[in-house]
Amino acid sequence: MFDSTLNPLWQRYILAVQEEVKPALGCTEPISLALAAAVAAAELEGPVERVEAWVSPNLMKNGLGVTVPGTGMVGLPIAAALGALGGNANAGLEVLKDATAQAIADAKALLAAGKVSVKIQEPCDEILFSRAKVWNGEKWACVTIVGGHTNIVHIETHNGVVFTQQACVTEGEQESPLTVLSRTTLAEILKFVNEVPFAAIRFILDSAKLNCALSQEGLSGNWGLHIGATLEKQCERGLLAKDLSSSIVIRTSAASDARMGGATLPAMSNSGSGNQGITATMPVVVVAEHFGADDERLARALMLSHLSAIYIHNQLPRLSALCAATTAAMGAAAGMAWLVDGRYETISMAISSMIGDVSGMICDGASNSCAMKVSTSASAAWKAVLMALDDTAVTGNEGIVAHDVEQSIANLCALASHSMQQTDRQIIEIMASKAR
């Protein structure tokens, strides 16, 4: 809980972070479907014998190629099956944290028996939509999630409606802290970070604890594309320098390797994404360690990073064709810049250079290769900080970057929200053709 004596705006900032920065086990799109299946199974009279599911095109895109923790398998069908047979309906984004070896075996058997189907919901106007219907004979239960990864809007069984709420608004519109955040500025966020009592934001240190553990796992195990471990080996071989820049990339990408490779450790997510949480956390942690920052300075830097990432992502669709590791890395750039010199000018220049650098990176679905994009974004963030420290940045005379950082952010988000919709459709079409 936060101090009720804080001014209302700061309270909303803290609430926004508490709502958007949460532990998540596994890639959050398959996990959203697993949660729907788990809640449906909890409502079903009798054991689950069959699972049917429907998801939005964007959720299908992000679920086709990612490993579900503990299963060694990729895709939405195993997520739906395991959610139904071994999920904890009360655990939110950690729905699979208690899944046993027996539950995993049962889920795989259900899949092998052809008792699990996942289809694209048609028509579907929602960007984030998942519906799971579980059966026991003629008895059934159905759960629908819309707008946010854990935002259950409808529960129904063969006996009738159990729960319903309005499902046509977005998660951002439902959450008053995010609505407040949409009306703020980076300068106001920086003032908050500089002046808020440490005790009120100490909780953000949990993001460092969780994501550092995931990073260590990525370096010690053969997860995903093992980018972090590979780059670390190249340092030992003398092909890559053992310096701060390398450490930022290695430790950040290692956490994503483990995350996307199916490690059974939670990530601290940001804006519904584990990779965004990793990207907003690990570069800041590495720089803080380099400068010997104490817990208070680390907490303030992490709060700036996570809150800036949320602030930018809040201007985007929940899922889009824009790789949001890039926007999370803009938050990381802010946090790292604050650690080095703390000036608003340095922070704003770093973010502007990020927008001029990696803003064209597409999201072609969740997969092991996300760690490549995470590593690229982390590297670009530190490069932008180094440029800003030398009073150098992409200027408002170039591309979509404006003279004002707030306008630069708005330009980027307008591009992702409108023009890149066709890009998203093309990506989904290409991925669907590969799956056939």
UniProtKB/Swiss-Prot annotation:
Molecular function GO labels: L-cysteine desulfhydrase activity
Top-rank lineage group of the source organism: Bacteria
InterPro entries: Ser_deHydtase-like_asu (IPR005130), UPF0597 (IPR021144)
GO annotation, biological process: L-cysteine catabolic process to pyruvate
Family: Belongs to the UPF0597 family.
PANTHER family for the chain: UPF0597 PROTEIN YHAM (PTHR30501:SF2)
Protein name: UPF0597 protein YhaM
